[in-house]
Amino acid sequence: MSSLIVKSLGSIVSIIARIFFFRRSRPVSNPRTTAHISYFRMSRKRPLSLQTVELKVRMCCTGCVRIVRNAISKLRGVDSVEVDKELGRVRVVGYVDRNKVLKAVRRAGKRAEFSPYPEPPLYFTSTQNYFVDPSKEFKESYNYYRHGYNGTEQHGNIPVGSRGDDRVSNMFNDDNVNACRLM
């Protein structure tokens, strides 16, 4: 009997406390305004600065492009999404955290990593990059959980040397009229 009285008094006290202490004011003047909705959905944290996030995502068809674009555009704070299927690059601009963008793409079922090279090089700059098989680029040493890079030791821009207008590969080509002929 006493436990029933204690439970009923506790519920009455919680209802009274909820009514008087946790009541939020809503604008009553115009019922069509949405100011009260945005007030309750405001983020409590400080907003992030505008960032450009570049990802390297394995995409094979237009369906993959659509899946990646939809997964990223659902994030709060994304301004624009640029997807390049041929290069396998995704550029996201907005007030977002780069790790959240990476996790959103991975949740969509795509293998993704941060792109260490912001712009594609004009041509191959080393033999290591020239003889790379693109099918083995996403291999078993994929560092999925640690930091988002695919285990390469090169991060950042590669210095590109200039070779001039004529390429070395065309110097001994038979199709080139001005080529060097050695017999």
UniProtKB/Swiss-Prot annotation:
Positions of the HMA domain: 50-113
Sequence positions that bind a metal cation: 61, 64
Example GO molecular function: metal ion binding
Domain of life, per lineage: Eukaryota
The keyword Protease is annotated on this UniProt entry: no
Keywords in alphabetical order: Lipoprotein, Metal-binding, Methylation, Prenylation
Keyword DNA repair: no
Propeptide residue span(s): 181-183
One matching Pfam family: HMA
Gene3D superfamilies: 3.30.70.100
Lipid attachment locations (S-farnesyl cysteine): 180
Xref: SUPFAM superfamilies: HMA, heavy metal-associated domain (SSF55008)
Residue numbers carrying Cysteine methyl ester: 180
UniProt family annotation: Belongs to the HIPP family.
Role this protein plays: Heavy-metal-binding protein.
Entry protein name: Heavy metal-associated isoprenylated plant protein 44
Species of the source: Arabidopsis thaliana (Mouse-ear cress)
Encoding gene (name): HIPP44
